[in-house]
From Swiss-Prot:
Phosphorylated by PKS3. One of its GO terms (cellular component) is nucleus. This is Ethylene-responsive transcription factor 7. Residues 26-83 bind DNA. The gene is ERF7.
């Protein structure tokens, strides 16, 4: 049984001189010194001068130093002695990776804020209903009768609108122009201890009982002579028991 031959790598044939000695290959940018070392240098296209790269023990090391300098000066169009090495040890791979990463990165979009817009969170639903709710919650003008209710906490309608606006997704946010401010003379609010006040022209009527003139006497002093306590009528007299 015949065995197959193993694969072998055959190097390039070196030129041979007439005397039988092997001629060393010549590399771009490499010169051999008389004492046996190899010097590498390259021409700078911008400065129009030669740049010294150093002295090496072998011609291959000097040729690789020239190739590295040529790629740094001329880029991918540089003429080199050896093809570009695609292995991870290549010094040009990190630069190529960073360049590709910058090209693939998306551009940064800056959100420009318009100072003339009122950024309110309006939902993507019916905007007219929200305007009607604002008109109802706003007090009417002085020409029309209105009821102003005094309260210490936030209005339930506004609280519900705020909670619904926060619950809406971000893609449903819209911007609308700022509503004009209401003039202070368009609304009148006379709030005191009474629950509600009705303003109808010059006639102001309170839902609570009208204020009545107090009796002209003081409980801290004895009754005065000549003062009619029942001048306002018996209906206005309210008896109160004082207990000490």
């Amino acid at each position: 049984m015949r065995k197959g031959r193993g694969s072998s790598v055959v190097g390039p044939a070196l030129p041979v001189t007439a005397g039988g000695s092997v001629k060393e290959p010549r590399y771009r940018g490499v010169r051999k010194r008389p004492w046996g070392r190899f010097a590498a240098e390259i021409r700078d296209p911008l400065k129009k001068s030669r740049v010294w790269l150093g002295t090496f023990d072998s011609a291959v090391d000097a040729a690789r130093a020239y190739d590295t300098a040529a790629r740094n000066l001329r880029g991918p169009k540089a003429k080199t002695n050896f093809p570009i090495d695609c292995s991870p040890s290549s010094p040009l791979q990190p630069l190529t990776y960073l360049h590709n990463q910058n090209l693939c990165s998306p551009p940064v979009i800056q959100n420009q804020i318009d100072p003339f817009m009122d950024h309110r969170l309006y939902g993507g639903g019916n905007f007219q209903e929200q305007q009607q709710q604002q008109i109802i919650s706003r007090p009417a003008s002085s020409s029309m009768s209105s009821t102003v209710k005094s309260c210490s906490g936030p209005r339930p309608m506004e609280a519900a609108a705020a909670s619904s606006s926060v619950a809406k997704p971000l893609h449903a946010i819209k911007r609308y122009p700022r509503t004009p401010p209401v003039a202070p003379e368009d609304c009148h609010s006379d709030c005191d201890s009474s629950s509600s006040v009705i303003d109808d022209g010059d006639d102001i009527a309170s839902s609570s009982s009208r204020r009545k003139t107090p009796f002209q006497f003081d409980l801290n002093f004895p009754p005065l002579d000549g003062v009619d306590l029942f001048a306002g009528g018996i209906d206005d007299l309210h008896c109160t028991d004082l207990r000490l």
